[in-house]
């Protein structure tokens, strides 16, 4: 087969053959196979050229994808599939990128976890889930997590939550709120509980009473539209108790309120 035309098309070259076949190749392919107009290729040479062209093009795509941020092996492979790189070529591209240290799942996991320690708020369980979603294997994640101390981060997150809610919730509800938030963020129950030891939940009686008054007014406005009498009183009690207020304090307020 003879090359009848070579034309540059942006980042690729269009090659046309005398059997009416055409294909796009990279500049690396042109150089490697010394392609030029009127050059004759046998079947083996043509197949080698096609394979290298896919490999070269796929690698260039991957490097473009990696230029924005670190990616996992799986993320790069998925990106190549999306751009219709042949499936049997993808492992070769991934291997080259690994050998040249463009991708490294262990380093990616380490960087992701360290960045979270500096400016994130996620515990180990959530971090592991996010890394697994990127296609990183547990054996690349677990050793790094086990060597990372999350106690200071848990304290920082709990302090932020404490500052946000301390003027809105009584001590018990505030503790429950912080604990649940830390669990949702992926911290262990023990770590969440331990982080509470660094917070001051000793609100004064007047502060708690003021919070109770505000919550009672709020619940009354909502519940009095549907209920009255004894049912309203019971509904108010249940709502306030769920918010973490003391049973005796609630009953005292309700006696004077209704």
UniProtKB/Swiss-Prot annotation:
Keyword Aminoacyl-tRNA synthetase (UniProt): no
InterPro entries on file: RecX_HTH_1st, RecX_HTH_2nd, RecX_HTH_3rd, Regulatory_RecX, WH-like_DNA-bd_sf
Pfam families: RecX_HTH1, RecX_HTH2, RecX_HTH3
Alphabetically ordered keywords of this record: Cytoplasm
Location (main, coarse): cytoplasm
Localisation: Cytoplasm
GO cellular component: cytoplasm
Signal peptide limits: none
Domain of life from the UniProt record: Bacteria
Cited Gene3D superfamilies: Winged helix-like DNA-binding domain superfamily/Winged helix DNA-binding domain (1.10.10.10)
GO biological process: regulation of DNA repair
Family: Belongs to the RecX family.
HAMAP family: RecX
Function per UniProt: Modulates RecA activity.
Protein name: Regulatory protein RecX
Species this chain originates from: Streptococcus pyogenes serotype M18 (strain MGAS8232)
Organism classification: Bacteria, Bacillati, Bacillota, Bacilli, Lactobacillales
Gene, per the UniProt record: recX
């Amino acid at each position: 087969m003879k090359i009848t035309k070579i034309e540059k098309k942006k980042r690729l070259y269009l090659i046309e053959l005398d059997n009416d076949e055409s294909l796009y190749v990279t500049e690396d392919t042109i150089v490697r196979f010394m392609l030029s107009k009127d050059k004759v290729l046998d079947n083996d040479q043509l197949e080698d050229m096609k394979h290298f062209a896919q490999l070269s093009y796929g690698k260039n795509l991957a490097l473009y994808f990696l230029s924005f941020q670190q990616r996992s092996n799986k993320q790069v492979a998925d990106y190549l599939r999306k751009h219709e790189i042949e499936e049997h070529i993808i492992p070769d591209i991934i291997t080259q990128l690994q050998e040249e240290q463009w991708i490294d799942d262990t380093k990616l996991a380490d960087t992701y976890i360290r960045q979270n320690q500096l400016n994130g708020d996620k515990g180990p369980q959530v971090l592991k889930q996010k890394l697994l979603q990127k296609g990183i294997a547990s054996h690349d994640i677990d050793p790094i997590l086990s060597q990372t101390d999350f106690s200071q981060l848990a304290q920082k997150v709990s302090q932020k939550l404490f500052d946000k809610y301390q003027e809105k919730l009584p001590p018990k509800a505030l503790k429950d709120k912080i604990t649940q938030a830390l669990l949702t963020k992926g911290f262990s129950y023990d770590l969440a509980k331990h982080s509470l030891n660094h917070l001051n939940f000793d609100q004064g009686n007047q502060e708690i009473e003021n919070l109770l008054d505000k919550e009672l007014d709020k619940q009354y406005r909502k519940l009095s539209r549907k209920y009255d009498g004894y049912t309203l009183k019971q509904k108010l009690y249940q709502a306030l108790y769920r918010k973490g207020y003391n049973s005796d304090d609630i009953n005292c307020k309700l006696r004077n309120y209704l």
